[in-house]
Every structure is written in structure tokens, then in C-alpha cells.
Amino acid sequence: MDTILITVDALRADHLSQYGYERETMPVLQDCFAEGTTQFENAFANGTHTGISLPSLLTSRYLGDNPAINGPTIASALPDGVTTIGLHSNTYFAARIGEPAGFDIFEDFDVGASRETEATRSSVHRLFRKTMDAIRPTVERFGLREKAETMQRTIFPARLIHESTAYETAERTTNRALELVDDVEGELFLWVHYMDPHRPFCMHLDEPEYTDERLSSGEIHDLMSEAGINPDQITAEERELLIDLYDSELRYTSREIRRLINGLRDRSRWKNSNVIFTADHGEEFGEHGYYYHRNRPYDELLHVPMFVKGPHTGESLSEQRALLDVAPTICDWHDVSQPGGFLGEPLFEGDSRRVIATGSFTDSLPVVAGRWGGWKYIKTGDVRELYDLTADPNECENMAAAEPDRAELFHEAIPERLMNEDHSGVPTDTSDEVSERLADLGYLE
């Protein structure tokens, strides 16, 4: 029996039609995760960014139990005879966490290494883009835009014209995953992490989807930087453009996930496999004053999609679940005991979870949130927030002063160690290439 774990970076649940969004941003979920699949309506991340949430997913522990990633993981818990493969290209995860334990094959696309071919391609590509951006007004004035774009596509494939160098594209991620699967005999555990919905957003000219206008790389970069540094200066029109770019990335990623699934089908590794699809965290678009994921544990960052194909699946499940529950579920599927230290439970067992999530502001103040019983509690330094999620699902009216006893109950239920942990952890001892990628991802603003 094979197990497939597909995760998407920065994918918020409410930007999927399956969770009520007006756009069908990920049709692969409807086509490949419909019959015999359970949709979890209330799945939540245990951290607000990758460096917290992915370790929690892989180890079923909180980042406050640092260094959790060096302990048992999903991969190390699985029995002998199961080939374990992991793929990701998240520079932040690689720089901060390194390689999780237990994977027979772990592919991070050599993140941060000196790669002459890739570096040369990227440098030439950036120079070409800058030149095209500089001469664009002249090109358009003389009606030469079509010829310029033809020349651009001749030099660089269309899919690369606005490609980020901060991570590998979904296309290359799928290609590499299928290459690695081809070398496996016997049972397989495959984890594939797609990065494309994470900033920096790109334009895929072969499938633009939701962007009506073609933007230069410089224009996109400037807008993303402004949203990160001066979010209060972003206009309503610019916000909608950022959302269009984000949704287009979801659609592009959907296409590549479909190709992964079709490839697994062709290799007879899909029909009878157990599958989990989820995200490491969501994304902000100014709901609480910030863009991207500034580590503030409101639901736009914590509420993630989750679809599961396997034993006992079907219909939907509304009780709260957490990413901590992924590893115990996979252990259960493979009939192995959970390692000591796993804090989650199998997804199809038990009552609604008490979700605890950690994060931090960019000034590194520890932030901890608790979400259960229809309420959300957030503690940032000495400041407390409390939200009635039934009456105030958008978390706008802080009830901590009006409900001090309830706030105190939340406070007492959250482990003290999580309230004192520095959860920012932006790596500083990195190569120039890694630092450049971290900057492109927005972590150094």
C-alpha cells in the first residue's frame, strides 16, 4: 500500500471553490478528490509559516518542542520495506530546518548550493527581463510588442518568462517526483510540497487565468514589495491584482498536481493509494493590516484545506482537526504504533481538536493562539485577544477585556513553553544565494 502526501505552500482554504470561493482555482480537487474522499471543513495549521507548520506536520509536535525535526517523523516511523521520498524547494525550510529524519530520498533541489547552470540561466534571464522592462515604452509606442514577445519566447520558454528563482516551479517539482518514483520497487511513501502560491507570484503566459493584463516582472516585484513593506499604501485595485496573481498561481499548481496524479496512475500508484492533500498555512491579503504571512495567527493563515482518500473516507467532516494529526493518520494506515512524542491523533478518530498554533510578529515577539469551543485566543507578548468566532468569524472585535475569565482559561490551557519560544527564526548565517532567495520570498523585509 502506497501513501501520497501532497502539500501546497500558502494555500488558504477559502480560495478554493470546495470551501465556497467563487473561482474554481483548483479543479484537480473536484476531478481527482471527489468520489471516496473526505473533505475536512475545519482543518488548521499549527503555525503561521513554513518553518513552524511543516515541522509540526512531519513530527506531530509543536515548534516549541524544538528541535522537533530531529526527532521521529512520519518517514522514520514507517516500517522497513516502505521507501520514503520527500521533495520540496522552500529555501526557508531548508535553511532553518535542514533534512528531516527518516527519508530514504530527500530532494530539496540543492537549495542554496552553488549551481553554475541554474545561476547562469537566472542571471541572463534577469538581465533580459530588466532590458525588456526598460525598453517596453518604446516597443509599445512603435507597435513592436508582439515581435518583442515572440523574441522573448524564442530565447526563454513561455513558462519561464516570469518564473521565480526563489523556488522550483510546480512543473519541475512534478517532473522530479515522477523520476524518483520510477526507481522505487515495493511500497512507497511520497511527500511532495509545491511552492508556487508563495510569494513571489509569477505570470505563466501559457495559462494566465485570472490576470487580464500582462505585467512586467518589475511591476510585479514592485507591487509585492510595496505590499510587504507598506501594506497600508496598497489600493483596493492593487489588492485585487495581488489576489488575481495568487489565484492564477493556484490554477497553475492545480495543473501540475493533476499531472503528478496522472503520472502516478500510469505507474499504478494512485488507485489503491492512501492520499492526503493539505497546505502548510494560508495567506493574508490585508484582512488584518498585512499581506502574505506575517505570522499573525488569524484564520486567513491557519485555516487550510484538507482532503483525504483512504480507509473510512467519504462525505465531509466538520470537527476541528490539525496538521498534528497527519503523521498519526499515516502511521495508522501502515499499522505501526505512533512514536513517543507524537501529540496528534488519527484524523478519523476522537472529538473536535483543541488547535494550538504558534507564530510571531516580524519583531520576534512570541505569538500563541488557541482555537476551540467557537472561540479564538491570541497572546502576543503581554497583549491578549479573544474572538467569538460564531458572532465574529473575521476576528475583528477583541473580547478579551469583556471576557477576562474565558481568556484566562485559554491562557492556562496552552503550554507555557509555547508562550516563551522565539518562533521567528529567520536564518542569518546563509550564503548569498540563499539570502537572495529568502529576500524574494519576503522573509527579510
Q: What label would you give each PLM region?
A:
Residues 1-445:
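Catalytic domains that recognize anionic headgroups
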